[in-house]
Amino acid sequence: MLLNSKRQLAILLAVLSLVALVLVGRWGNARKIGGQGPAEPFRIAGNFYYVGATDVAAFLITGPEGHVVLDGGYPTTAPLIMASIAKLGFDIKDVKVLLNSEPHPDHGGGLTVLQQASGAQLWAS
Protein backbone atom coordinates (compact mmCIF):
# COMPACT_ATOMS: atom_id res chain seq x y z
CA MET A 1 0.00 0.00 0.00
CA LEU A 2 1.41 3.34 -1.03
CA LEU A 3 0.76 6.22 1.34
CA ASN A 4 0.38 9.52 -0.49
CA SER A 5 0.41 11.88 2.43
CA LYS A 6 1.34 12.38 6.02
CA ARG A 7 -2.38 12.47 6.81
CA GLN A 8 -2.88 8.93 5.43
CA LEU A 9 0.12 7.73 7.41
CA ALA A 10 -1.25 9.32 10.59
CA ILE A 11 -4.66 7.69 10.05
CA LEU A 12 -3.05 4.30 9.42
CA LEU A 13 -0.93 4.57 12.57
CA ALA A 14 -3.96 5.61 14.62
CA VAL A 15 -6.00 2.63 13.36
CA LEU A 16 -3.15 0.19 13.98
CA SER A 17 -2.65 1.60 17.48
CA LEU A 18 -6.34 1.18 18.26
CA VAL A 19 -6.32 -2.41 16.98
CA ALA A 20 -3.22 -3.16 19.06
CA LEU A 21 -4.86 -1.77 22.21
CA VAL A 22 -7.98 -3.87 21.69
CA LEU A 23 -5.97 -7.03 21.03
CA VAL A 24 -3.70 -6.50 24.04
CA GLY A 25 -6.73 -6.04 26.29
CA ARG A 26 -8.39 -9.19 25.00
CA TRP A 27 -5.16 -11.16 25.19
CA GLY A 28 -4.63 -10.10 28.82
CA ASN A 29 -8.14 -11.19 29.77
CA ALA A 30 -7.77 -14.50 27.94
CA ARG A 31 -4.49 -15.17 29.74
CA LYS A 32 -6.20 -14.81 33.12
CA ILE A 33 -8.46 -17.77 32.36
CA GLY A 34 -5.94 -19.96 30.57
CA GLY A 35 -6.90 -18.78 27.12
CA GLN A 36 -10.47 -20.03 27.25
CA GLY A 37 -13.78 -18.35 27.16
CA PRO A 38 -17.23 -19.79 27.61
CA ALA A 39 -18.72 -21.58 24.62
CA GLU A 40 -22.37 -22.27 24.00
CA PRO A 41 -23.08 -25.94 24.88
CA PHE A 42 -24.98 -27.94 22.30
CA ARG A 43 -26.25 -31.41 21.44
CA ILE A 44 -24.03 -33.19 18.94
CA ALA A 45 -26.26 -36.23 18.47
CA GLY A 46 -28.62 -38.19 20.68
CA ASN A 47 -27.30 -38.05 24.24
CA PHE A 48 -23.87 -36.65 23.26
CA TYR A 49 -23.21 -32.96 24.04
CA TYR A 50 -20.41 -30.41 23.67
CA VAL A 51 -19.71 -28.76 27.05
CA GLY A 52 -16.19 -27.41 26.47
CA ALA A 53 -14.76 -23.92 26.22
CA THR A 54 -13.82 -21.86 23.17
CA ASP A 55 -10.46 -23.60 22.72
CA VAL A 56 -10.68 -26.75 24.88
CA ALA A 57 -13.13 -29.53 24.07
CA ALA A 58 -15.11 -31.47 26.65
CA PHE A 59 -18.12 -33.69 26.13
CA LEU A 60 -21.08 -34.93 28.16
CA ILE A 61 -22.68 -38.32 27.51
CA THR A 62 -25.97 -38.63 29.37
CA GLY A 63 -27.78 -41.74 30.51
CA PRO A 64 -30.55 -42.81 32.89
CA GLU A 65 -28.05 -44.28 35.37
CA GLY A 66 -25.70 -41.30 35.32
CA HIS A 67 -23.57 -39.24 33.01
CA VAL A 68 -20.00 -39.33 31.70
CA VAL A 69 -17.79 -36.29 31.09
CA LEU A 70 -15.01 -36.82 28.58
CA ASP A 71 -12.02 -34.57 29.39
CA GLY A 72 -11.88 -31.72 31.86
CA GLY A 73 -9.76 -29.09 30.17
CA TYR A 74 -7.45 -26.93 32.24
CA PRO A 75 -8.24 -26.24 35.91
CA THR A 76 -9.79 -22.93 34.80
CA THR A 77 -12.00 -24.79 32.30
CA ALA A 78 -13.86 -26.80 34.95
CA PRO A 79 -16.23 -23.97 36.00
CA LEU A 80 -17.05 -23.36 32.32
CA ILE A 81 -17.81 -27.08 31.85
CA MET A 82 -20.02 -27.15 34.95
CA ALA A 83 -21.89 -24.05 33.73
CA SER A 84 -22.43 -25.69 30.33
CA ILE A 85 -23.75 -28.87 31.95
CA ALA A 86 -26.19 -26.81 34.02
CA LYS A 87 -27.22 -24.71 31.01
CA LEU A 88 -28.21 -27.91 29.21
CA GLY A 89 -30.43 -28.80 32.19
CA PHE A 90 -28.22 -31.49 33.71
CA ASP A 91 -26.75 -31.67 37.22
CA ILE A 92 -23.01 -32.11 37.84
CA LYS A 93 -23.95 -34.44 40.74
CA ASP A 94 -25.42 -36.88 38.19
CA VAL A 95 -22.01 -37.31 36.53
CA LYS A 96 -20.76 -40.75 37.60
CA VAL A 97 -17.61 -41.07 35.46
CA LEU A 98 -14.94 -38.59 34.39
CA LEU A 99 -12.94 -39.99 31.49
CA ASN A 100 -9.51 -38.56 30.64
CA SER A 101 -8.58 -39.21 27.00
CA GLU A 102 -4.89 -38.29 27.27
CA PRO A 103 -2.33 -37.14 29.86
CA HIS A 104 -2.09 -33.49 28.85
CA PRO A 105 -3.12 -30.54 31.04
CA ASP A 106 -5.65 -29.34 28.46
CA HIS A 107 -7.50 -32.67 28.83
CA GLY A 108 -7.03 -33.56 32.50
CA GLY A 109 -6.21 -30.35 34.35
CA GLY A 110 -9.80 -29.65 35.39
CA LEU A 111 -10.72 -33.19 36.39
CA THR A 112 -9.89 -32.68 40.07
CA VAL A 113 -12.32 -29.76 40.29
CA LEU A 114 -14.98 -31.72 38.40
CA GLN A 115 -14.43 -34.77 40.62
CA GLN A 116 -14.81 -32.69 43.78
CA ALA A 117 -18.04 -31.16 42.45
CA SER A 118 -19.55 -34.41 41.19
CA GLY A 119 -18.10 -37.20 43.33
CA ALA A 120 -17.58 -39.15 40.09
CA GLN A 121 -15.04 -41.90 39.48
CA LEU A 122 -12.03 -40.88 37.41
CA TRP A 123 -11.03 -43.17 34.55
CA ALA A 124 -7.99 -42.62 32.34
CA SER A 125 -7.41 -44.10 28.92
Each language-model region and where it sits:
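N-terminal Sec-pathway targeting helices
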Residues: 1-16
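Hydrophobic alpha-helical membrane-insertion segments, chiefly the h-region
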Residues: 16-26
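Ser/Thr/Pro/Gly-rich low-complexity linker/stalk segments immediately outside membranes or between
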Residues: 26-37
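Conserved beta-strand hairpin/beta-sheet module of binuclear metal-dependent hydrolase folds
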Residues: 35-92
